[in-house]
UniProtKB/Swiss-Prot annotation:
GO molecular function: GTP binding; metal ion binding
EngB-type G domain location: 30-204
Disulfide links within the chain: none
Gene: engB
Name by which UniProt lists this protein: Probable GTP-binding protein EngB
Function according to Swiss-Prot or TrEMBL: Necessary for normal cell division and for the maintenance of normal septation.
GO CC annotation terms, alphabetical: cytosol
Binding locations of Mg(2+): 45, 66
Length: 216
């Protein structure tokens, strides 16, 4: 049984901080930030809301609705960041290019960024966007944790097989340092496991618990 996670209390008092269209509009680059990324329609906003027990991120039936860097305050030193969704076919190409430019600027310059949570639809994993984020994570040494979202859409055995297959592919191409798990927002599957990863990155766990979270 996992110990009570200190991030839960912080999330209960989480609040919207600011939206930024580009890097120079972001909050002061201090403290610790964890960013959430995912291709449009991968369930990113639903996952963020479920992990924080709050309706922080805007959800919509239209993928790509989140077009800004959205910052949420946990306390004076810790933030969560909802990054723009990418890849939705109906989004105009110039807007897609704007998103990519400023996402790359954020990822490349943000000193407070301490971890990246990447959402992949379990039925359509390892898209071009996902591979780009994996490449960047390995090249930059940024800790990355993958949520295979919408795991409830598959039978349990099929979901486990998908997890094993994706894990093997990631280890083959990107090495052993990337963690991955099943996740379902409606069923709250994998919530505690993901919260432990967040707490470790945000320096909220005793050393021994942090090491356990990293091994998950």
């Amino acid at each position: 049984m996992l110990p009570k996670n200190p991030i839960i209390g912080l999330c209960q008092q989480a609040s919207f901080l600011i939206s930024a269209a580009k890097v120079d509009q972001c909050p002061e680059d201090s403290g610790l930030e964890v960013a959430f990324a995912g291709r449009s329609n991968a369930g990113k906003s639903s996952a963020l809301n479920t992990l924080t027990h709050a309706s922080l991120a805007r959800t919509s039936k239209t993928p790509g609705r989140t077009q800004l860097l959205n910052f949420f305050r946990l306390d004076d030193e810790r933030r969560l960041v909802d990054l723009p969704g990418y890849g939705y076919a109906k989004v105009p190409i110039p807007l897609k290019q704007h998103w990519q430019k400023h996402l790359e600027a954020y990822l490349g310059s943000r000193e407070s960024l301490c971890g990246l949570v990447l959402m992949m639809d379990i039925r359509h994993p390892l898209t071009e966007f996902d591979r780009m984020m994996l490449d960047w994570s390995v090249a930059s040494g940024m800790p990355l944790h993958i949520l295979l979202t919408k795991a409830d859409k598959l039978a349990f055995g099929a979901a486990k097989n998908a997890l094993l297959k994706v894990r093997q592919e990631i280890r083959k191409q990107w090495g052993e340092g990337i963690s991955i798990q099943l996740f379902s927002a409606p069923k709250r599957m994998g919530v505690e496991e993901a919260q432990m990863v967040l707490a470790g990155w945000l320096d909220l766990l005793p050393q021994e618990d942090e090491e356990s979270a990293e091994e998950a």
